[in-house]
Amino acid sequence: YVIKFFVGRSKPKKTKFVISDLDFNDGTHDVHVDHIIINTQGVHVIETENMKGIIYGKESETEWEQSLEHGKLMKKFYSPIKQNSGHIYSLKKKLNTTVPFFSYIVFTKRGSLAVKTVHVPVEYPFAFSQTIKNKKAHDVLNHDQAEELYHAILALKKN
């Protein structure tokens, strides 16, 4: 849903390659990446969450909390920022590239976000589509290089 939302609103002539549900082994761990967008700015790695309730967390924290039943039930879960950071580390390790990687966390609108971050956007789908569309980063790849990186990432996929 998140990627369809973004891709559907993009200009078709821009260089953009999309991979969803990438499973690979980085040599140590099995890794699942929800979505990757490769464009001329680099590699955008998106972790999606579909949680209800109120989500509390800070960028620096390892555990976040999900408040359910009007605060009567609190569930801890691993920070999606830390999780996505691990995905990016594994991708860089396998690809051996200096291309910039960007991290994004996207929650569906089932819940409310009470999250504080500075470097990693934690947003709903519409805000994410605006964030990535308006991303201020230098182009580091041409179309052919972006396509080559796309195929290199696809080659990591477990059969």
Predicted regions and their residues:
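Surface-exposed interaction regions that form or flank ligand-binding interfaces
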Residues: 1-31, 37-43, 49-57, 63-159
